[in-house]
C-alpha cells in the first residue's frame, strides 16, 4: 500500500470535461500514435488548464512520456512514428503541415530526466536560445539571464560564477539551470519528463518547490513515476495504462476517490 499525504494536495479544481477555451492551454483530441506496427497511444482526449500543474502517471511503458513528447512534436524525431488526431494550441492543430515546428518548441519548452547542460558557461547556457533567435544585445541578454535564473531559483547560488562551466554545478543545480534555459525564451508551456528521477531527495524537494512557483507564469505538464510527487505538485492528474487514458481528474480525486478500478489498483500499489 502506498501512503499519500492528502494534506499536501491542491484543493482548487476545474470541471475538466467542460473547461472553457479561455482556461484551456492545450486540448488533445482523439490522439493515436504508432511506432511502425506497434500502437503506443489509443484515442487520448483531454484538456489541460492554463497555469496549472498537470501530472501524467502510470506504470513503465504506459505511454505517459510518449504523450508528453507529442505536445512539442519531439516524436517527429523518431523513425516510423505516425500520429492521428489533434493537439490544439490557441485553437490550432500543432500537427498542421503549416506549423513552424521550431517556433512551436520555443513556445512549448521541455526538460528531460537527466540534466543536460551544454559544455558552456552558466551564462551562455541560459542565453543560448535567445542567441539562436538573433538576440545579441548585452543588456537584454543580461536581464534575461538574471530573470531566468531567479525564476529557476538558482540565481543566488550562481550570480558570482556566471562564467564558470556549467558542468561544475551539482546535479540539482544543473537541472535548475536547464529549467532556466527553457524559460529564458518565455514559453507558454513547460514539459517536464521525470525531472527529478536522477536527483537526490534534497534536490528533488527544491525542484518540486520550483514547479509550484513556475505555474504562476507557465502551464506545467510533468511525467513522474513518483505518486507522492504527483500528489504534492500537481493540480490535475492523468492516469495512463497500456497507452490509454484511464482517468483524468483533479489530483485530490485521483488519489482519494478514483472512479476507475484500474486507477485505484495502481494508486494502492496492487500493480505498477
From Swiss-Prot:
It is a peripheral membrane protein. GO terms for cellular component: plasma membrane. Residues 26-267 form the ABC transporter domain. One of its GO terms (biological process) is phosphate ion transmembrane transport. InterPro entries: AAA+_ATPase (IPR003593), ABC_transporter-like_ATP-bd (IPR003439), ABC_transporter-like_CS (IPR017871), P-loop_NTPase (IPR027417), PstB-like (IPR005670). SMART domains: AAA. It catalyses: phosphate(out) + ATP + H2O = ADP + 2 phosphate(in) + H(+). Its EC number is 7.3.2.1. It comes from the Bacteria. ATP binds at residues 58-65. It is found in: Cell inner membrane. PANTHER family: ABC TRANSPORTER I FAMILY MEMBER 17 (PTHR43423), IRON EXPORT ATP-BINDING PROTEIN FETA-RELATED (PTHR43423:SF12). Belongs to the ABC transporter superfamily. Phosphate importer (TC 3.A.1.7) family. NCBIfam families: 3a0107s01c2. Part of the ABC transporter complex PstSACB involved in phosphate import. Responsible for energy coupling to the transport system. The complex is composed of two ATP-binding proteins (PstB), two transmembrane proteins (PstC and PstA) and a solute-binding protein (PstS). This is Phosphate import ATP-binding protein PstB 1.
Amino acid at each position: 500500500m502506498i501512503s499519500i499525504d492528502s494534506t499536501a494536495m491542491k484543493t482548487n479544481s476545474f470541471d475538466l470535461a467542460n473547461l472553457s477555451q479561455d482556461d484551456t492551454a492545450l486540448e488533445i483530441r482523439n490522439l493515436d500514435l504508432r511506432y511502425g506496427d506497434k500502437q503506443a497511444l489509443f484515442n487520448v482526449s483531454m484538456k489541460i488548464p492554463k497555469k496549472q500543474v498537470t501530472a501524467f502517471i502510470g506504470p513503465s511503458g504506459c505511454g505517459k512520456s510518449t504523450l508528453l513528447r507529442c505536445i512539442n512534436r519531439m516524436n517527429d524525431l523518431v523513425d516510423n512514428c505516425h500520429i492521428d488526431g489533434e493537439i490544439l494550441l490557441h485553437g490550432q492543430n500543432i500537427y498542421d503541415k503549416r506549423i513552424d515546428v521550431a517556433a512551436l518548441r520555443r513556445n512549448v519548452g521541455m526538460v528531460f530526466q537527466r540534466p543536460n547542460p551544454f559544455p558552456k558557461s552558466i551564462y551562455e547556457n541560459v542565453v543560448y536560445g535567445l542567441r539562436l533567435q538573433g538576440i545579441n544585445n548585452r543588456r537584454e541578454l543580461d536581464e534575461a539571464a538574471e530573470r531566468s535564473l531567479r525564476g529557476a531559483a538558482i540565481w543566488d547560488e550562481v550570480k558570482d560564477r556566471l562564467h564558470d562551466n556549467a558542468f561544475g554545478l551539482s546535479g540539482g543545480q544543473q537541472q535548475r539551470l536547464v529549467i532556466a534555459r527553457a524559460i529564458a525564451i518565455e514559453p507558454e508551456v513547460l514539459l517536464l519528463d521525470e525531472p527529478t528521477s536522477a536527483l537526490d531527495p534534497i534536490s528533488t524537494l527544491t525542484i518540486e518547490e520550483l514547479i509550484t512557483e513556475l505555474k504562476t507564469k507557465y502551464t506545467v505538464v510533468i511525467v513522474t513515476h513518483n505518486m507522492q510527487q504527483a500528489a504534492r505538485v500537481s493540480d490535475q492528474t492523468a492516469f495512463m495504462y497500456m497507452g490509454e487514458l484511464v482517468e483524468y481528474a483533479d489530483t485530490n480525486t485521483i488519489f482519494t476517490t478514483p472512479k476507475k478500478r484500474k486507477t485505484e489498483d495502481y494508486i494502492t500499489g496492487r500493480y505498477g
